[in-house]
Amino acid sequence: MTDSYGAVSVDVGTIYLGGKEHRVKTASGVVSVIVYGDREKPALITYPDLALNHMSCFQGLFFCPEAASLLLHNFCIYHISPPGHELGAAPICPNDSVPSAENLADQILEVLNFFGLGVVMCMGVTAGAYILTLFAMKHRERVLGLILVSPLCKAPSWSEWFYNKVITNLLYYYGMCGVVKEFLLQRYFSKEVRGNVEIPESDIAQACRRLLDERQGINVLRFLDAIDRRPDISSGLKKLKCRTLIFIGDQSPFYSEAVHMAATLDRGYCALVEVQACGSMVTEEQPHAMLIPMEYFLMGYGLYRPSLFSESPRSPLSPSCISPELLSPESMGLKLKPIKTRISAA
């Protein structure tokens, strides 16, 4: 059914946690948003990495019972998909203009306004982390905090530019072929998860490969083009007074970029958690490693797991509830760095 705001709401009870899909029209195209939970609760916005959506990027985290109890008890979840990355998406018309990273960040504001949201918590992975960070820099008053997984903040390096160019050509001529999926799995996961001649590919990688089969090559190409043209936002990070929790796998190709971002942000507002034996997508590969740092991080907003605090939050969160002590690096989890976790061979 179409409403007066120009969005179509579709019941998708069989899709991820029984959420509801809203298709929100923005200046840069239609955006799919899966909403799950009580909309009177504070909002948690998620944004996935290249070629992924909420099913392939955040399912592991939200299916982790401890993390789910922490996040779903305290937030209403708004899973935003990059244009054309939602489940069952058709190919985007080639004549449609290709959005820039800034256009995608502006879409976030339009989504928030459509749902009538004020300040929100944001969680993004790699390319999605860049989009949400850019949004926070442009609209600081709308962002309560950032939870970033393997984030980007600089313009592409020569090696990343070359890597992206190879994928671009493959997508253009062959679509989501096997070679493209192999490149993407290298982007997402550690060697242990991807497997080799001696170690079989893990269930996580196999599931991701199947979900990548559903992506339209032209749609992935458009998002890749936006990310490949991204500007360096490092200088703006120094002015971003926003509490930020960064996770990075020690086998991620973006490890040095995440460390650079953490070093650039104000130490009083940022904590970096390194996860051992893990690639970029910590949300899928080692979601349990995120639990304790997130608990410490959210305690600064008076949010707890149900076993610790039974009341359900109903009012918008405000940074004013944060005591100065909770803005110290120690209170934000730096004592937990690095997280010593290992993956056992399947």
Curated annotation (Swiss-Prot):
Q: What is its main location?
A: cytoplasm
Claim: Transport is one of the keywords in the record: no
According to its UniProt record, where is this protein located? Cytoplasm
- Induction field: Induced by sucrose and glucose. Down-regulated by auxin.
Organ and tissue specificity? Expressed in root vasculature, cotyledons, leaves, petals, mature stamens and pollen grains.
What Pfam families does the record tag this protein with?
Ndr (PF03096)
Q: What happens when the gene is disrupted?
A: Slight reduction in length of primary root.
Question: Do you know which Gene3D superfamilies this protein is assigned to?
Answer: alpha/beta hydrolase
Q: Does the keyword Cytoplasm apply?
A: yes
Q: Which UniProt keywords apply?
A: Cytoplasm, Growth regulation
Q: Which family does it belong to?
A: Belongs to the NDRG family.
The entry's function note states: Interacts with the heterotrimeric G protein beta subunit GB1 and plays an significant role in GB1-dependent regulation of lateral root formation. Involved in a signaling pathway that modulates root auxin transport and auxin gradients. Acts partially by positively regulating the auxin carrier PIN2 and AUX1. Acts, together with GB1 as positive regulator of meristem initiation and branching.
Assembly mode: Interacts with GB1. Interacts with the heterodimers formed by GB1 and GG1, or GB1 and GG2. Interacts with RGS1.
Protein's name in the database: Protein NDL1
Q: Which organism is it from?
A: Arabidopsis thaliana
**Gene name, please?**
NDL1
